[in-house]
Amino acid sequence: MLHVSDLMREMKCDCFCWNSAHNSLHQESFYKMDCPFSDLWRNYLNANECGLGHSMDSNEQSLKLLEENEVVCFARFEYKECRTKIPYLKKLENGYMAVYPHLSAYPKENEALIMKVNQMILSHCGVDIVENRIVYLNKEYVRQDALDLNELLCISDKLFNKRNHLSKTIAECMEEVDVDLDGWIERTKEILNRPSVTPVRTKQCTALRRCNYYSVCFNESNEPDDSILFFTTNQHKLDAYDRGIRHIHELPLNQIEGFRLQYAQYMASKTQKPFMDRAALQVWMKQIKYPISYLDFEWDTFAVPPYMNMKPFDVLCFQYSLHVETSDGNLTHYNFFESKDCRRHFIEQLIKDLPKAGTILVYNMEGAEKLRLKQLASQFEEYREELESICSRMIDLSKPFEAGLYYNSKMRGHYSLKSILPVFSKDVSYHDLDIQNGLNAVFAYRTYDEKDEEEKKDVKEAISTYCQMDTYAEYVVYHGLIKEVEKDA
């Protein structure tokens, strides 16, 4: 037995399809939801009093539900051992309307493929879908005291293009899709029935973001630190690896695009020592003024805004760690942790703890801490001036690495703080922490309010210790760069 989702995975990669069925990975939701999304869209569509399908329903049971109800949610159907579930079916004079709710602000035109497949499967079962709709989140909705579903959710017969504009109708998109359903089902069955699959590296393995099964398919632990596989944004590296090239410096120069970061990697590989643009690093360091504040936030993302003045997919900061270093080398730590709607207290405590002058060093700030403060400024206008002042003093500690001013092959093509820390310190490490990455911190935070007081204390300590490690790592990395610049100067 397979599901329509298996067909979609087959489109991506044989290994992804097979691993999803045989090596399923537990994944926490990226978004925090205070209630199931299905509760919200069913209320929006007035579908609380309707027929409900169940996981093992046969075609006959689903057809009976449709016969007895004007609206059926979660109806199951099967064709050639391929099952599917339709979120919402409404009876019309000439057939049925299917509605597909998306926990997204911009359901894309490629969603028409699964709608076409579902339409074909239901057609084989004697159910004619004549209209399709999507329900999606209104990105511009700003919550007031109560959640307004009529403002939060939208319904449309169109899908979004790559520029996030409603463009073609669902019907037009479906007309452009050509599906050999029988062949697709048989091909997917054949893949899933194999005892194993042989992985093949392609650009799709790391496109947009690395596949969850990448480390399952490819063990790169034995690759050299300067492996050609770690050559950032190089379009020839996979072909080169297949030809037997193992080190970055072995790649012909005419196959190197010439980005600054690539040059840093190439030189580190060629010389077998760290590459450093000393002059550029010195210029970058001159802008950093004492006292230096090393800052890091932890936050959770809410698809549906839980509190006033929040929008869909806004975040809520629940933790910060702050190390403040004075010119005489003294290092002081400040910490904040709260649950629920702690935004105002977060802002007030941060303003209080941060020095009024000096540089604020943040790792990868533009899409993280700086963006978080801008969002808070829009939610709490009375603090806008102070928050914007904080943003103006921020300097991104990741820039020297991302811009190729410093590269050590031990980084193995990675530029996260955790990847860079071991380059500058063997003693400071995340390995012994109960929480070792930001996602684990978020998932621990989500359970915080459900714990008893003793457990809450443990969760708070684990999250705070992890966040404190981030800011101390920033301190270690910055001073590591200083030592590199001063070495043999």
Predicted regions and their residues:
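Conserved DEDDh/DEDDy metal-dependent 3′-5′ exonuclease domain
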Residues: V71-A75, R83-K90, A98-A105, E109-L181, ...
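Acidic, Mg2+-coordinating catalytic module of metal-dependent nucleases/exonucleases
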Residues: K162-E223, I420, S425-A489
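Metal-dependent nuclease catalytic cores that hydrolyze phosphodiester bonds in DNA/RNA
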Residues: M1-N94, Q235-T271
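Two-metal-ion RNase H-like nuclease active-site motif
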Residues: N69-F77, P291-T301, D396
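Long, highly charged low-complexity segments
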Residues: E250-F297, F302-V304
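Helix-loop elements that line ligand-binding/catalytic pockets
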Residues: T198-E250, S339-R343, L350, E388
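Conserved RNase H-like, two-metal-ion catalytic cores of nucleic-acid enzymes
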Residues: A98-Y100, A280-K356, F380
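Short helix/loop capping segments that flank catalytic or ligand/cofactor-binding pockets
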Residues: N19, N219-S221, A240, H249, ...
